[in-house]
Amino acid sequence: MAVNVYSTSVTSDNLSRHDMLAWINESLQLNLTKIEQLCSGAAYCQFMDMLFPGSIALKKVKFQAKLEHEYIQNFKILQAGFKRMGVDKIIPVDKLVKGKFQDNFEFVQWFKKFFDANYDGKDYDPVAARQGQETAVAPSLVAPALNKPKKPLTSSSAAPQRPISTQRTAAAPKAGPGVVRKNPGVGNGDDEAAELMQQVNVLKLTVEDLEKERDFYFGKLRNIELICQENEGENDPVLQRIVDILYATDEGFVIPDEGGPQEEQEEY
């Protein structure tokens, strides 16, 4: 039977979006680029098969699922596995299948803790287990470039920014030759431009997801701040500690003057 995990609070142990994708891709040998792609439920089903062999009817899991009713079917298989192994967790299927970042990110944070509590380190071949199937990729815009970010994602579990910088450094050597080739008019320049555009599209999606993640946590902090302000006159020491944490700044940090950023930009 499974070891249940009930903690859902945000802690320092929680992984960032990039680290979470790196863990999933490395563990299951997938090419996921967005947390939202977990909405199909297929990855969770395979993780359950890894943790508890035989708990999931993996042959029935649709790794190429692209429609909501297919996602729901996968989550039904996952629910059956949870029930079989005594996992005391309600899966918010109706929210997850919508493919929203916030809902999927919260659930995968819990699932990572559940995985860590139950994984015994045994060998597992994810590709053979799913008979070579790959998960369907929703954003067709970046489909040709999916193989490129896989290496930086799986090689970095400590630096969320590393996938971005790796792609930039990889593109730099090609930019020079690309400019030189324009003069002779060789067709290779078009291929190189297309490749660079693919990398730009991947970076744009990465920035978009980072902004969503930022707004998600900022919204939580803003709600906490409002609650503290509503109860400001109660002289609650716990409340005061929360306020102190909310407004704390790094040592040596100075709020810039209104003209500060403008002057810096001009010098730049």
UniProtKB/Swiss-Prot annotation:
<dbReference type="InterPro" id="IPR036133">
    <property type="entry name" value="EB1_C_sf"/>
</dbReference>
<dbReference type="GO" id="GO:0031115">
    <property type="term" value="P:negative regulation of microtubule polymerization"/>
</dbReference>
<dbReference type="GO" id="GO:0031110">
    <property type="term" value="P:regulation of microtubule polymerization or depolymerization"/>
</dbReference>
<dbReference type="GO" id="GO:0001578">
    <property type="term" value="P:microtubule bundle formation"/>
</dbReference>
<dbReference type="GO" id="GO:0030981">
    <property type="term" value="C:cortical microtubule cytoskeleton"/>
</dbReference>
<dbReference type="GO" id="GO:0071539">
    <property type="term" value="P:protein localization to centrosome"/>
</dbReference>
<dbReference type="GO" id="GO:0051233">
    <property type="term" value="C:spindle midzone"/>
</dbReference>
<comment type="subunit">
    <text>Homodimer. Heterodimer with MAPRE3. Interacts with DCTN1, DCTN2, TERF1 and dynein intermediate chain. Interaction with DIAPH1 and DIAPH2. Interacts (via C-terminal residues 206-211) with APC (via C-terminal residues 2674-2843); the interaction inhibits association with and bundling of F-actin. Interacts with CLASP2, DST, KIF2C and STIM1; probably required for their targeting to the growing microtubule plus ends. Interacts with MTUS2; interaction is direct and probably targets MTUS2 to microtubules.</text>
</comment>
<feature type="modified residue" description="Phosphotyrosine">
    <location>
        <position position="124"/>
    </location>
</feature>
<dbReference type="GO" id="GO:1990498">
    <property type="term" value="C:mitotic spindle microtubule"/>
</dbReference>
<dbReference type="Pfam" id="PF00307">
    <property type="entry name" value="CH"/>
</dbReference>
<dbReference type="GO" id="GO:0031116">
    <property type="term" value="P:positive regulation of microtubule polymerization"/>
</dbReference>
<dbReference type="GO" id="GO:0008104">
    <property type="term" value="P:protein localization"/>
</dbReference>
<dbReference type="GO" id="GO:0051315">
    <property type="term" value="P:attachment of mitotic spindle microtubules to kinetochore"/>
</dbReference>
<feature type="modified residue" description="Phosphoserine">
    <location>
        <position position="155"/>
    </location>
</feature>
<feature type="modified residue" description="N6-acetyllysine">
    <location>
        <position position="220"/>
    </location>
</feature>
<dbReference type="GO" id="GO:1905721">
    <property type="term" value="C:mitotic spindle astral microtubule end"/>
</dbReference>
<dbReference type="GO" id="GO:0000132">
    <property type="term" value="P:establishment of mitotic spindle orientation"/>
</dbReference>
<keyword id="KW-0131">Cell cycle</keyword>
<feature type="modified residue" description="N-acetylalanine">
    <location>
        <position position="2"/>
    </location>
</feature>
<feature type="region of interest" description="Interaction with CDK5RAP2">
    <location>
        <begin position="185"/>
        <end position="268"/>
    </location>
</feature>
<feature type="region of interest" description="Interaction with MTUS2/TIP150">
    <location>
        <begin position="124"/>
        <end position="268"/>
    </location>
</feature>
<dbReference type="GO" id="GO:0045296">
    <property type="term" value="F:cadherin binding"/>
</dbReference>
<dbReference type="InterPro" id="IPR001715">
    <property type="entry name" value="CH_dom"/>
</dbReference>
<dbReference type="GO" id="GO:0005815">
    <property type="term" value="C:microtubule organizing center"/>
</dbReference>
<dbReference type="GO" id="GO:1902888">
    <property type="term" value="P:protein localization to astral microtubule"/>
</dbReference>
<dbReference type="GO" id="GO:0046785">
    <property type="term" value="P:microtubule polymerization"/>
</dbReference>
<feature type="compositionally biased region" description="Polar residues">
    <location>
        <begin position="153"/>
        <end position="169"/>
    </location>
</feature>
<feature type="modified residue" description="N6-crotonyllysine">
    <location>
        <position position="66"/>
    </location>
</feature>
<dbReference type="GO" id="GO:0005925">
    <property type="term" value="C:focal adhesion"/>
</dbReference>
<comment type="function">
    <text>Plus-end tracking protein (+TIP) that binds to the plus-end of microtubules and regulates the dynamics of the microtubule cytoskeleton. Recruits other +TIP proteins to microtubules by binding to a conserved Ser-X-Leu-Pro (SXLP) motif in their polypeptide chains. Promotes cytoplasmic microtubule nucleation and elongation. Involved in mitotic spindle positioning by stabilizing microtubules and promoting dynamic connection between astral microtubules and the cortex during mitotic chromosome segregation.</text>
</comment>
<feature type="region of interest" description="APC-binding">
    <location>
        <begin position="220"/>
        <end position="242"/>
    </location>
</feature>
<dbReference type="GO" id="GO:0016477">
    <property type="term" value="P:cell migration"/>
</dbReference>
<dbReference type="GO" id="GO:0051010">
    <property type="term" value="F:microtubule plus-end binding"/>
</dbReference>
<keyword id="KW-0963">Cytoplasm</keyword>
<keyword id="KW-0206">Cytoskeleton</keyword>
<comment type="similarity">
    <text>Belongs to the MAPRE family.</text>
</comment>
<dbReference type="GO" id="GO:0051301">
    <property type="term" value="P:cell division"/>
</dbReference>
<dbReference type="GO" id="GO:0005794">
    <property type="term" value="C:Golgi apparatus"/>
</dbReference>
<keyword id="KW-0493">Microtubule</keyword>
<dbReference type="GO" id="GO:1902480">
    <property type="term" value="P:protein localization to mitotic spindle"/>
</dbReference>
<feature type="region of interest" description="Disordered">
    <location>
        <begin position="146"/>
        <end position="187"/>
    </location>
</feature>
